[in-house]
Amino acid sequence: MRAAGVGLVDCHCHLSAPDFDRDLDDVLEKAKKANVVALVAVAEHSGEFEKIMQLSERYNGFVLPCLGVHPVQGLPPEDQRSVTLKDLDVALPIIENYKDRLLAIGEVGLDFSPRFAGTGEQKEEQRQVLIRQIQLAKRLNLPVNVHSRSAGRPTINLLQEQGAEKVLLHAFDGRPSVAMEGVRAGYFFSIPPSIIRSGQKQKLVKQLPLTSICLETDSPALGPEKQVRNEPWNISISAEYIAQVKGISVEEVIEVTTQNALKLFPKLRHLLQK
């Protein structure tokens, strides 16, 4: 394996998505050719846990697994709903089964979009599901890979209240001032290729110190073009845009963000050296 410091780490992607069922080998080969050294594969629901673990075996040391229960469950767009504690109860025994092989717990978090969490009860149940998963991560000494759509401040507040330490806030959509509260708590923020079409993400990157930034694609979502399948090799778009905003070289962005990923995910260094 190449030295951990020289390649790109995609800190958040959905390789178990049906979008990749037909050509995942090709997609991953393209990523390797684009100097991607690790893909952090996150889960949304218990139904994809086995698939993610199988991918991590098949692409050992390249696809690194995270298991967790996302705040939005069900299939888009018609059947999506806010998470319940029952969803978590189904997932927990499977997570326990694989705990020693996990890089992190994720994708977990809060999603207060009105169509998913229109009531106080739904928001509270999301909070309870997140609290239990933060407690699980702490017990297993694992980082958390976090979703916070329309819930930036409540998510950061809850993470702090629960004493979460190693935290990645993926594709953060809140205000830079709220993100800076996360920076002060030692959290990292991962930036997807959709930054090239998002004024909010561009403002965020201007404010965030490079030492708090990681790279992600969120593949197959959040690509450079809307409605076009995103792929891990597009991660270079994030690196290039951050370099442009910060007025530094792409090489420096890659080096620092990969070092950040190694700090965030302690198991990563060992896995990259396999």
UniProtKB/Swiss-Prot annotation:
Belongs to the metallo-dependent hydrolases superfamily. TatD-type hydrolase family. The gene is TATDN3. Exhibits 3'-exonuclease activities and apurinic/apyrimidinic (AP) endonuclease (in vitro). Show preferential AP endonuclease activity on double-stranded DNA substrates and 3'- exonuclease activity on single-stranded DNA. Changing residue 107 to A: Reduces AP endodeoxyribonuclease and 3'-exonuclease activities. InterPro entries: Metal_Hydrolase, TatD-like. One of its GO terms (molecular function) is nuclease activity. Keywords: Endonuclease, Hydrolase, Metal-binding, Nuclease, Nucleus, Zinc. GO terms for cellular component: mitochondrion; nucleus. It comes from Homo sapiens (Human). Zn(2+) 1 binds at residues 12, 14, 107, 218. Its EC number is 3.1.11.-, 3.1.21.-. Pfam families: TatD_DNase (PF01026). Its cofactor is Mn(2+); Ca(2+); Mg(2+); Zn(2+). CDD domains: TatD_DNAse (cd01310). It is an enzyme of class 3 (hydrolase). Binds 2 Zn(2+) per subunit. Exhibits AP endonuclease and 3'-exonuclease activities in the presence of Mg(2+) and Mn(2+). In contrast, in the presence of Ca(2+), shows AP endonuclease activity exclusively. The 3'-exonuclease activity is sensitive to the metal ion present in the active site, whereas the AP endodeoxyribonuclease activity is observed in a variety of divalent metal cofactors. 3'-exoxonuclease activity is suppressed in the presence of Ca(2+), Zn(2+) and Ni(2+). It is found in: Nucleus. This is Deoxyribonuclease TATDN3. Zn(2+) 2 binds at residues 107, 147, 170.
